[in-house]
Amino acid sequence: MIFFAETQTAGVPEIITSLFPNLPNFIAHVIATIVLVVILSKLMYKPFRKTIKDRRNKINELLSEAVQKQTEANIGVRKAEALLQDAKTESSLIIQTSKVDADIQKTHIISEAHKYADIIKNQAEKDIAQERSKIEAEIKTTIVNVAFDAAEQILQTEINKTKNKKIVDEFIENLDK
């Protein structure tokens, strides 16, 4: 075991001497690394952060612009929907108004047709009544003439006209009753 311990102690300084061959070189390497890190951070990290920050600002600006455009588009859609709804309401109102106007015109036309039919019917009734009166007058005149002729032939004597007319009128009045 001692042999093992001696090899370990003997090997440790070799590793340390292998890792740190020269202390001044090691310190110089550490200082050079620190200087490199400081210089690189000043030359690279700050511009890199600035580029990242600019990129982040550009992305935020684009997102903000997209949100604004989306909002404007939504407002436009709402306006279009409102216009569409107004157009539907207006067209419905126009259709209802047209139906009411058509019903009014239909009623007016039917009323005028009934009035015209009544006028034609009344005129026809008047014409029929006039024709009837005219025919009745002609029939009465014909009957009177036939009666005069018959009476004249029967009596074979001439009776004066006023007396004949009086007799015939009395006869006709008795016929009407």
Curated annotation (Swiss-Prot):
Q: Name one GO cellular component term.
A: proton-transporting ATP synthase complex
Q: How does the record say this protein sits in the membrane?
A: Single-pass membrane protein
Q: Name one GO molecular function term.
A: proton-transporting ATP synthase activity, rotational mechanism
Check the record and name the InterPro entries matching this protein: ATP_synth_b/b'su_bac/chlpt, ATP_synth_F0_bsu_bac, ATP_synthase_B_chain
Q: List the transmembrane segments.
A: 19-39
Chief place where the protein resides? membrane
Where it sits in the cell: the answer is:
Cell membrane
Q: Does the keyword Transmembrane helix apply?
A: yes
Record key words, sorted: ATP synthesis, Cell membrane, CF(0), Hydrogen ion transport, Ion transport, Membrane, Transmembrane, Transmembrane helix, Transport
Q: Could you tell me what this protein does?
A: F(1)F(0) ATP synthase produces ATP from ADP in the presence of a proton or sodium gradient. F-type ATPases consist of two structural domains, F(1) containing the extramembraneous catalytic core and F(0) containing the membrane proton channel, linked together by a central stalk and a peripheral stalk. During catalysis, ATP synthesis in the catalytic domain of F(1) is coupled via a rotary mechanism of the central stalk subunits to proton translocation. Component of the F(0) channel, it forms part of the peripheral stalk, linking F(1) to F(0).
* Quaternary structure annotation from Swiss-Prot or TrEMBL: F-type ATPases have 2 components, F(1) - the catalytic core - and F(0) - the membrane proton channel. F(1) has five subunits: alpha(3), beta(3), gamma(1), delta(1), epsilon(1). F(0) has three main subunits: a(1), b(2) and c(10-14). The alpha and beta chains form an alternating ring which encloses part of the gamma chain. F(1) is attached to F(0) by a central stalk formed by the gamma and epsilon chains, while a peripheral stalk is formed by the delta and b chains.
Entry similarity comment: Belongs to the ATPase B chain family.
Protein name as catalogued: ATP synthase subunit b
What organism does the UniProt record list as the source? Mesoplasma florum (strain ATCC 33453 / NBRC 100688 / NCTC 11704 / L1)
Gene designation: atpF
